[in-house]
């Protein structure tokens, strides 16, 4: 909101400059000519301050549409929390959270930025960027209705390939990214233990109890 307020202030400065060239200001007999450098500066600043918020709004809408598809058309509304939002969030220690009743998904700072970074170079994705993809898929599964964390995570693991493709990642790269997360990030949860073990199940494997046998599953043969 502060970014938008700053942008509106510079828009007002631009408006005042243009209006001053059309209508004489109090105490002057004629309008003043427009100061082109000043007008250009305030317009650039208006756009620069508006961009972070506008980009976040666009990205949230983009993610909401894809999350809805992942959640079998249960309506999802993704909100990318700013640092301030995250600090005030009762679930600030979680990377994300979702309410299946409202469809609202909150992704904590900085994970939306990490996901955006992943989408800019998926063929060079690091472990953290692959985790951001899984967070998005995981919360979409909550909107779908599953609340058990280990089952939800297994549903996400099987759909990360689908999620990556919905987000615009090329097929071959999406498959590799999804498998990399399953073989590395997901298996690491078992090794770390503690709270991470709540997101892991030995039955989350091809042919085991949690295998949904999806035609486009992460681990399905091409």
Model-found features: residue ranges?
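Metalloprotease/metallohydrolase-associated module, dominated by Zn2+-dependent proteases
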Residues: 2, 7-21, 34-38, 55, ...
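Active-site recognition of the HExxH zinc-binding catalytic motif
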Residues: 130-158
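Membrane-helix interface linkers and caps
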Residues: 20-30
